[in-house]
From Swiss-Prot:
SUPFAM superfamilies: dsRNA-binding domain-like, Ribosomal protein S5 domain 2-like. Residues 22-85 form the S5 DRBM domain. This is Small ribosomal subunit protein uS5. The N-terminal domain interacts with the head of the 30S subunit; the C-terminal domain interacts with the body and contacts protein S4. The interaction surface between S4 and S5 is involved in control of translational fidelity. It comes from the Bacteria. The gene is rpsE. GO terms for molecular function: rRNA binding; structural constituent of ribosome. It comes from Rhizobium leguminosarum bv. trifolii (strain WSM2304). Pfam families: Ribosomal_S5 (PF00333), Ribosomal_S5_C (PF03719). The keyword rRNA-binding applies. The keyword RNA-binding applies.
Length: 189
């Protein structure tokens, strides 16, 4: 009943292949200090956003005495906390959505083809790693990168696919799409 153990090299290679599908962006790096009996001990804190550019994205926070180690820890934490966000046509949001964390508030709006990513700082990193191509975002309140990223994730978690909405309402997805296109044409006139 003894199971054969694969060599570690193969485990490492499969892990590297899995990690190669992700794109990571460093959002913020801070120098932090811990006060100890002999004075201050300095370290670094990193905030990293990771995504596969196909609708999965996550963020992580890591602290260490050296910058590369803090970034590595943050990247690993981000890969453990991935969420899936349904995208319309693989490029934008299905509907407008608000998010909030602490004093940071964000408004995310779907956009037409060719609009691009109109967002500042930390939000842009989230959208690029998510694989979103057209979105308009506005942040108000706190401009702290940690709050902005968490508020953006709060908004993205509230993104609902129209198929789920149709199922909740007990109607067919095609009916919902027809209503959506009819209301879209009426607003353009």
């Amino acid at each position: 009943m003894a199971q054969e153990r694969r060599p570690q090299r193969e485990d490492r290679q499969s892990r590297e292949e899995r990690d190669s599908e992700f794109v990571d962006k460093l959002v913020a790096i801070n120098r932090v200090a811990k006060v100890v009996k002999g004075g201050r001990r300095f370290g670094f804190a990193a905030l990293v956003v990771v995504g596969d550019q196909k609708g999965r994205v996550g963020f992580g926070h890591g602290k260490a005495r050296e910058v590369p180690e803090a970034i590595r820890k943050a990247t690993e934490a981000a890969k453990r906390e991935l969420i899936f966000v349904p995208l319309r046509d693989g490029r934008t949001l299905h509907h407008d959505v608000h998010g909030r964390h602490g004093a940071g508030k964000v408004l995310l709006r779907s956009a037409k083809v060719g609009t691009g990513i109109i967002a500042g700082g930390p939000m842009r990193a989230v959208f690029e790693t998510l694989g979103m191509h057209d979105v308009v975002a506005k942040s108000t309140g706190s401009s702290n990168p940690y709050n902005m990223v968490r508020a953006t994730f709060d908004a993205l978690k509230h993104q609902v696919h129209p198929k789920d909405i149709a199922a909740q309402r007990g109607i067919k997805y095609a009916t919902l799409q027809a209503r959506r296109s009819a209301s879209g044409n009426a607003s353009e006139e």
